[in-house]
């Protein structure tokens, strides 16, 4: 029951009234209307009073207040009933429907739009693009259908002139995935004639008043509704409709839905063609019927994609087939006018049906496999014309009111009859509540062979000329004694009925007088085949698809089509069966006054609606009855998890006993009754309490299941990881063994080969053995080197080590390292190198050995040296394991300077073929020399030998020696930095130092 509203607003639920009487009901309804509370509950039924003004109660904030809430938690609202239908559909996977009923102008169409708005707002929390697209198109379809199916009447500015039932399909998550729209009985007669003060369909005015000038010119239209016969009745009538703005909104909606530009243009052409058809006038010249304004025919032909002579022939002649002969029968003026109007009505009806089908093509649910996507559920929303009583009521009003009788019958059967019958069947104590059952009125209309529709069909099928008077006579004869039928002939004293024209039906909503004038023609719904062929042969493909029967041959005999009333009756029976298969929710709309005033509450008018809608009886049944009932096994299946007595399964003798024990255990036994097969729960609060407890337990069970499932997944994952690691371990072992076998196979016997396996290509190792292969290659290289070296004489081994040291320090940096020649070491002691002075050098060397006690002479050579005065001198260098001696070859190799070898920190050379060497000293007195520049011996490359000998010696003594290859070479002399560059000269025979600003330049021969 509704809460959170103060007593100053009256009772939010009529069930809470102190006494169930009509005066108290009306007093509460009036109070709530005056306080701006237009919605009131009757249990799970919403009573809605049209406020005739915009209220700020439909925004996003209001939607959030009702989302996921139970009925009793919030004040009465359309959103509450919409949410209840949505939750029922989602919780129980059962199709639901919302039936909106009430008379014309009671606010049914607006109610349906707010319900659609709410459903769209609360779904698709994950913002899936496809769901958003479907929601948008469902909402936009309302705008389009209102434009082409609604009109202004004297009772309603936006009256639905057709019946609409929309199914919204939801996936298993509760998100809309599509829908389907069914339309019923478009009031197409409104196209050609409207009652005083009423309008044609909105679409005509929207196009005339809202279309751009260029569009109007292409349609041969003027921005003047009084220029067209079919809209002229509104010329001086003021309307609250914003037609120009609505035109843009409808055009945009059609684009969003998916109408192609050429399809939208065709729609405008059809509307324009209908307006021009209405302006066609016929005249009689002797026995010939002619068209007075022939130019209009050309315009119509152009708009419909046909030739003007074909249009003219269809309007003036009717093709009749007699056997094999085909003749053209000319119309009289009356027949021509009838044919023109019938053609205009048919075109508009086909257009409307095509629009509905076009929308359905877009929003229909595509075929889905229920095993993959889950079961689709449906919420149906019925927005259909309300009960109508006009000054002149014809076949359209008769069908509309019959529709309302069927819906009232459904309400009675589901809410009143079936509910009370179920209580008696289940053995629940119950005091019967009387109500008016309108089945007798439904039978009066639809009964086979005896009902009004059957009698109307019989009249239409009779051979010869049958008039409306003859139909009325048949009604009087067959139904004269029926309690709900009357006519002037049946009741001669009733002067409100005109003789041979009117009959009265006592509907559940009141007495309605119908005029039989036009019943026969409207029921036959005659449209000459010539018009169908004309449209089928149109060059416009959209128009062609609207008239498929136009392809039939002129001489082909066709089956008599069902009449308009029978088609409508069949569709209503199917609709009611469809609604009865779903769980219904009701919105009962009430019209507060006839003046469309937001402040006036016409108590007499409202009381009449309350009475014929059966709202008071609804309150009595709801107050005395039960809000919820369910068979025992399904009840247990949903709620057994709440109690330990029933979870996971009970051991009691029957489900009924288990349910009784369950309700006692939950402390809710006071609000339940137990039938033979079902449990009945009186108040919604008890049901909501069960739902809350179930939701709480679901969380615990879900967590428990998640724990078990996550544990299972973790164990499975652990097993897979262990299995994977085992496989990986064995695979690695296999790869290692395969690799080692391949290495052993390839290097088998390399010890006996000439190059010790240098030519053998190493196999590609597994990733895990890459570092191992690098180490193995190092071991192999050391072994191969040992194999090569061990065959050398002991005296050659130091030279080999020196060459290795030179290679390690100069590889990739210097072009010529002299590795291919034999290294002499002490070139000054060589007779070949120093034939004239070698004895002098040997003598000086022996003297120094005795003096300095060195163990080994490493290197000696003539050099060109730059002294401290930046002068170039010929000198010799002698390097032992202890000192670096600088000697003067001109003075019998007199020692000029002796530098301890530990004072040498590094040497620098260039990358070219020159013999420039810089000895870097720790005291910054670097020695700059060019090897082999004395002119006493052949010129060759000794840089590699010098670097190798020194590097190998320093390595053996575990001292660092920095070897630098650069150009220019940077050095320091007497504390100053200088730079030495090397350049090549063609016409120079010997290397030569020259002074420059930065230091020195060494010029070397080109060859």
Curated annotation (Swiss-Prot):
Superkingdom of origin: Eukaryota
Positions of transmembrane segments: none
Signal peptide: none
Residue stretches making up the IQ domain: 699-719, 721-741
Annotated binding of ATP, by residue: 102-109
Keyword Ribosomal protein: no
Localization: Cytoplasm; Perikaryon; Cell projection, Dendrite; Early endosome
Annotated PROSITE patterns: IQ (PS50096), MYOSIN_MOTOR (PS51456), TH1 (PS51757)
Region (Actin-binding): 572-594
Domain (TH1): residue spans on this chain: 812-1006
Gene Ontology MF term list: actin filament binding; ATP binding; calmodulin binding; microfilament motor activity
GO cellular component, one term: plasma membrane
GO biological process: actin filament organization; actin filament-based movement; endocytosis; protein transport
Family: Belongs to the TRAFAC class myosin-kinesin ATPase superfamily. Myosin family.
Protein's UniProt name: Unconventional myosin-Id
Native source species: Xenopus laevis (African clawed frog)
Recorded name of the encoding gene: myo1d
